[in-house]
């Protein structure tokens, strides 16, 4: 089977400042995309294309259409006073489009991890999102959460890995690929491990010292008792 091709399009909106954290929508979306791109390439052999922060919308659409990916995923965060995730898809009345299927997979994964109620799958055509309308690939635009809400913003900053994993799982589901979990992290903080080991050794040594002292005291009591018995007998 030919390798799947994905175009990742993190936000290029440099002026959209997060309400906390001193970071922009563009920066955060790219940090999530960095993790996602690595996972798709290394774990599944997916061909990943990506926009550049210097591109404008027309250039992004043109670049995606030239690359001809299977899917185009625009990764954004939202503003306007709300909370939660919403996904924009190419919706056609009376028909379930591939864009809608992809949007549903992504929305399902984000609904599990977001800290508030989410906002549903919406029509990217009526919203006039060029990346949904004018790309030739199956396309969605994802608003992960609201960067003008303090709680959503803090969540976005703290959960980039979780957001990437949500995209990864959804893309796997759409392509019919088995999701591969990341291995559990192995500690490489040898100094910390050594400190913990030394602490445990010291604790055991202290317990042994206490036991020896108690045994010595019991032995002394026994010897005195034996001496008393001998004195009585004699």
Each language-model region and where it sits:
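A short, glycine/acidic-enriched catalytic loop
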Residues: 15-25, 78-105, 109
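Extended alpha-helical stalk/coiled-coil segments
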Residues: 185-231
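Active-site-adjacent mobile loop/cap segments within catalytic or ligand-binding domains
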Residues: 4-9, 13-18, 72-82, 120-183
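Mature extracellular/periplasmic domains of secretome proteins
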Residues: 58-69, 129-135
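Active-site histidine-acidic residue metal-binding/catalytic motifs
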Residues: 1-60
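Long, well-ordered alpha-helical scaffolding segments within enzyme catalytic domains
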Residues: 31-39, 97-115, 153-181
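Loop/turn elements at helix/coil->beta-strand transitions in domains of secreted/extracellular proteins
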Residues: 2-5, 43-47, 67-72, 113-117, ...
């Amino acid at each position: 089977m030919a390798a799947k091709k994905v175009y990742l399009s993190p936000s290029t909106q440099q002026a959209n400042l997060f309400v906390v954290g001193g970071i922009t929508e563009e920066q955060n979306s790219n940090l999530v995309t960095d993790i996602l791109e690595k996972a798709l390439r290394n774990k599944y052999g997916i061909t990943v294309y990506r926009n550049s922060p210097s591109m404008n919308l027309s250039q992004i659409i043109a670049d995606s259409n030239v690359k001809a990916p299977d899917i185009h995923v625009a990764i954004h965060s939202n503003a306007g006073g709300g909370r939660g995730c919403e996904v924009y898809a190419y919706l056609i009345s009376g028909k379930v489009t591939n864009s809608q299927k992809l949007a549903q997979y992504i929305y399902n994964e984000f609904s599990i991890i977001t800290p508030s109620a989410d906002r549903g799958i919406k029509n990217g055509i009526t919203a006039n999102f060029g990346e949904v309308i004018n790309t030739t690939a199956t396309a969605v635009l994802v608003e992960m959460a609201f960067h003008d809400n303090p709680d959503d913003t803090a969540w976005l900053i703290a959960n980039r890995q979780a957001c990437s994993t949500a995209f990864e799982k959804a893309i796997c589901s759409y392509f019919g690929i088995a999701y591969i979990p990341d291995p559990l992290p192995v500690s490489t903080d040898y100094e910390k491990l050594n400190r913990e080991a030394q602490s445990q050794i010291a604790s055991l040594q202290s317990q042994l010292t206490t036991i020896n002292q108690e045994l010595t005291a019991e032995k002394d009591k026994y010897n005195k008792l034996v001496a008393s018995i001998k004195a009585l007998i004699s």
